[in-house]
Structure formats: structure tokens, C-alpha cells
Design a protein with these regions (language model features):
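A cytosolic-side transmembrane-helix exit/cap motif
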Residues: 73-78, 106-110, 135-145
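Terminal transmembrane helical module of multi-pass membrane proteins
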Residues: 115-167
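C-terminal halves and exits of single transmembrane alpha-helices
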Residues: 91-114
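Mid-bilayer segments of alpha-helical transmembrane spans in multi-pass integral membrane proteins
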Residues: 61, 96-104, 124, 161
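Aromatic-anchored segments of alpha-helical transmembrane domains
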Residues: 33-38, 98-101, 156-165
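Non-cytosolic membrane-interface motifs at loop->transmembrane helix junctions
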Residues: 49-56, 86, 113-123, 149
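Juxtamembrane "helix-exit" motif on the non-cytosolic side of transmembrane helices
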Residues: 39-47, 104-112, 165-167
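Selected alpha-helical membrane-embedding segments in polytopic membrane proteins
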Residues: 1-90, 95
Length: 167
């Protein structure tokens, strides 16, 4: 599993069915465990850490299921039919792979004020890398074009923004 996560970080995804060998419960558990340091490192002053942690854990779980549903529909439109559980496993693996560099960036930028250029640039680098990593890996895993996978990721980002505003 560690090699597969490292490959995803290096943007060298295997076919989506390759990741079906991992139990979904384990993947979701690891994904949620990695939300804990993210919550502590990016805690806001407006609420308690317990609230932030609970909120982030629920968000991660709900959005992972929503993303898997979207991917089943989106890639099914072009004949790249994979099961919901395949996309759920793959999305959980991508989330694990994305959280590792984000935690590293949060560790580096936590010593700077939120309004400093270093924190802003670090945040932009993290967001850009995640969008790029998700898009390219998704294209490689499904055998679709990079533009089509990028469209799916843009829809995911839009859903996350709307979800974040409504909640």
C-alpha cells in the first residue's frame, strides 16, 4: 500500500482496478486518521478543535462518497465503467496521497502568519498540486483524457466549494 501511495504522490497511477485489493474500511480509516493532523495544523480561532476535527472528519467522509458517485457517472458517460466501490477505493487512496504533502506544507507554513506571503503561496502550491495530481492520476487510472479527468476534478472542486458555503 505504501508503494501505491508513493506512486500516486509521484503521479504514476495504476489502473483503477489495481486498488480493489485494499479493504475499503482500511482506506477510509487511514484517510480519516490523516484528517486529524490537518485539523490541528489548520485550526481556526473561531471554533474549538473538537468541533473542527469532527466537522473535518464528517466532511471528508461525505465528500469522498459524493466524489465516487460523481466519478461513476462522469466516466460512465464515456464508457469507462467501473463500480462505485472501485471509485470509492481509488478516491480514498488519492485523498491519502494528497493529505501527505498537504500536512508537510501545513507544518512548514504554520510558523508564519496566515496573511504572510509564505502561507498564501504555500496554500496555492498545495491546492494547485492536489488539482494536478488528482487530474493526471484519474486520467491514468481510468484511461481517459487529461482534459476529461480535469473536468471531473473541477466539478469536484465546485461541489466542495458549494458544500463548504452551505455547511
Amino acid at each position: 500500500m505504501i508503494n501505491d501511495i508513493a506512486d500516486l504522490i509521484k503521479i504514476q497511477s495504476k489502473n483503477i482496478e489495481h486498488y480493489n485489493k485494499y479493504p475499503i474500511a482500511l482506506l477510509l480509516f487511514i484517510m480519516l486518521i490523516l484528517e486529524v493532523p490537518s485539523s490541528f495544523l489548520s485550526e481556526s480561532n473561531e471554533s474549538s478543535i473538537a468541533f473542527d476535527l469532527t466537522f473535518n472528519l464528517l466532511n471528508a467522509l461525505v465528500l469522498t462518497f459524493i466524489e465516487a458517485i460523481l466519478f461513476v457517472y462522469w466516466f460512465g458517460r464515456i464508457g469507462k465503467n467501473h463500480s462505485f466501490l472501485s471509485f470509492l477505493r481509488y478516491d480514498a487512496m488519492l485523498s491519502i496521497a494528497a493529505n501527505i504533502p498537504v500536512i508537510a506544507i501545513l507544518l512548514i507554513t504554520q510558523n508564519f502568519e496566515e496573511s504572510s506571503w509564505i502561507a498564501i503561496i504555500g496554500g496555492l502550491i498545495a491546492v494547485s498540486y492536489i488539482i494536478y495530481m488528482f487530474s493526471v492520476n484519474l486520467a491514468l487510472a481510468t484511461g481517459s483524457s487529461g482534459k476529461y479527468a480535469f473536468g471531473a476534478i473541477l466539478i469536484v472542486v465546485l461541489i466542495q466549494l458549494i458544500y463548504g458555503v452551505l455547511i
